[in-house]
């Protein structure tokens, strides 16, 4: 079979493939540019290269060019330190990195995208497209140990796109506004869905509230991928009606009931999802109707995905295990990692979850974020949700700290522009939580650390001194 981009160029060539504020390419134009760059890339004589790229057209051309040249791409998070980049690339035997952004990194052969045309050209028309080949390599966050290299095959990506089409829905007339970084699976998956289906991606380099609102109001945007915090920023800034939006896909963090209530009040078509780097983006998806029935669900089990709970406790809570064609076959690095899959071939996600009587899947917390106090499990999300329900609190995060008596106890950081009576806040918790779950310390802070795409940096909350301003011990 031919590569998806070649098929779109032949059957859908005049349709816009990629649009930015500066430039646009049809599928035919994208294919010819990518094929030309692929002919130069073969001179590198590399099976696998690193990519240091951003959300722009050159980067999309480069991605497709690598695939046309049968080169695996290892994505580099541009926010990493040089030391982290070097360790990641060395772990998967990368010798050459191609970049569209300025980059200096010792120990590698570096080529800027614009300099590739100085290389010799070789024909790539004889290459055969193989679905079982590795398309991309991405790294997990490594917050629970060494960073893990995740190989994603073309078949993994295809299965993910098919699952998304079934649960979310898209077609060739779809226009998908994408601001999530394409070096992350959430961003790259939009590029892949587009080339598989033949729809248009409107690519945004960086999340800026005013620019995003302008694009939504000006262009016929039908789909959009966000994390919950960026949706909140958009609603606060004036996204109070759907305009042409048909689907807003949320992921990367848990939804609060307050956010869902606000979105539904504005008639925004929000879908919640669960996915990982290891599952090539979303694995489960909750429709607006599902969210109205159960706000905290990430969807239901279906015939295309297999889900089970490992060692459930008395409440039905246990580790979420999943199986499907979009799940990776195993890590490239470390190659032999214990407890990746169970004996039945289910991937062990590390998430604490429940499947209720209606088949709804509810994710409580990452196992690594779980607070264990005196042998009792405490889910930070539950505490954060109740905190945000207290009048005047705009944002909150709960983390565990060491305690000589209980092992760990929860503490709360919250954001407000009002004078909060902390005795009343504690009473609010007492009315909603068992005593062992009530935070033992409270810190009022100006803001919480989020990435540029709106994802809470929980690790920074644990490692940095946010204890500025008012605080109180209960």
From Swiss-Prot:
Pathway: Quinol/quinone metabolism; 1,4-dihydroxy-2-naphthoate biosynthesis; 1,4-dihydroxy-2-naphthoate from chorismate: step 5/7; Quinol/quinone metabolism; menaquinone biosynthesis
Entry's Gene Ontology molecular function annotations: ATP binding; medium-chain fatty acid-CoA ligase activity; o-succinylbenzoate-CoA ligase activity
Membrane-spanning residues: none
Catalytic activity: 2-succinylbenzoate + ATP + CoA = 2-succinylbenzoyl-CoA + AMP + diphosphate
Keywords assigned by UniProt, alphabetized: ATP-binding, Ligase, Menaquinone biosynthesis, Nucleotide-binding
Keyword Aminoacyl-tRNA synthetase: no
EC number, UniProt record: 6.2.1.26
GO BP term, pick one: fatty acid metabolic process
UniProt-listed InterPro entries: AMP-bd_C, AMP-bd_C_sf, AMP-dep_synth/lig_dom, ANL_N_sf, MenE
Gene3D superfamilies per record: 3.30.300.30, N-terminal domain of ligase-like (3.40.50.12780)
Broadest EC class assigned to this enzyme: ligase
Pfam families named in the record: AMP-binding (PF00501), AMP-binding_C (PF13193)
Protein task: Converts 2-succinylbenzoate (OSB) to 2-succinylbenzoyl-CoA (OSB-CoA).
Family under the similarity heading: Belongs to the ATP-dependent AMP-binding enzyme family. MenE subfamily.
Name of the protein described by the UniProt record: 2-succinylbenzoate--CoA ligase
Gene: menE
């Amino acid at each position: 079979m031919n590569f998806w981009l070649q098929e779109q160029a032949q059957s859908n060539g005049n349709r816009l493939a990629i649009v930015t504020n500066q430039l646009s390419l049809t599928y035919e134009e994208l294919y010819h540019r990518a094929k030309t760059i692929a002919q130069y890339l073969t001179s590198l004589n590399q099976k696998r290269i690193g990519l240091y790229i951003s959300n722009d057209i050159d980067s999309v051309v480069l991605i497709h060019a690598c695939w046309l040249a049968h080169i695996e791409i290892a994505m580099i998070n541009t926010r990493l330190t040089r030391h982290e980049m070097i360790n990641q690339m060395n772990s998967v035997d990368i010798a050459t990195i191609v970049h569209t952004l300025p980059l200096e990194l010792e120990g590698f052969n570096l080529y800027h995208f614009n300099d590739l045309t100085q290389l010799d050209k070789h024909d790539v028309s004889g290459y055969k497209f193989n679905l079982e080949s590795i398309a991309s390599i991405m790294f997990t966050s490594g917050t629970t140990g060494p960073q893990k290299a995740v190989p994603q095959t073309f078949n993994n990506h295809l299965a993910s796109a098919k699952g998304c089409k079934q649960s979310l829905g898209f077609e060739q007339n779809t226009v998908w506004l994408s601001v999530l970084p394409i070096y992350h699976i959430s961003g790259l998956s939009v590029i892949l869905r587009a080339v598989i289906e033949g729809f248009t991606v409107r690519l945004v380099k960086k999340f800026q509230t005013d620019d995003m609102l302008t694009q939504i109001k000006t262009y016929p945007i039908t789909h959009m991928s966000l994390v919950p915090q960026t949706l909140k920023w958009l609603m606060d800034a004036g996204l109070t009606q759907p305009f042409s939006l048909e689907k807003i896909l949320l992921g990367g963090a848990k939804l609060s009931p307050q956010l869902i209530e606000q979105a539904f009040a504005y008639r925004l078509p929000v879908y919640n999802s669960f996915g990982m780097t290891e599952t090539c983006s979303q694995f489960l998806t909750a429709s607006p109707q599902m969210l109205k029935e159960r706000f905290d669900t990430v969807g239901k089990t279906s015939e295309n995905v297999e889900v089970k709970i490992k060692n459930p406790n008395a409440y039905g809570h246990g580790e979420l295990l999943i199986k499907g064609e979009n799940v990776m076959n195993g890590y490239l690095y470390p190659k032999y990692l214990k407890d990746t899959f169970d004996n039945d071939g289910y991937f062990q996600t590390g998430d604490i979850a429940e499947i209720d009587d209606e088949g709804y899947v509810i994710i409580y917390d990452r196992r690594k974020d779980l607070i264990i106090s005196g042998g009792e499990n405490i889910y930070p999300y539950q505490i954060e949700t109740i905190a945000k329900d207290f009048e005047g609190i705009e944002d909150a995060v709960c983390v565990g700290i060491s305690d000589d008596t209980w092992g760990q106890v929860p503490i709360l950081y919250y954001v407000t522009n009002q004078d909060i009576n902390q005795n009343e806040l504690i009473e609010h918790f007492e009315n909603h939580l068992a005593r062992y779950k009530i935070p033992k310390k409270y810190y009022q802070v100006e803001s919480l650390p989020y990435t540029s795409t709106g994802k809470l940096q929980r690790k920074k909350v644990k490692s940095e001194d946010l204890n500025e301003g008012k605080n109180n011990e209960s």
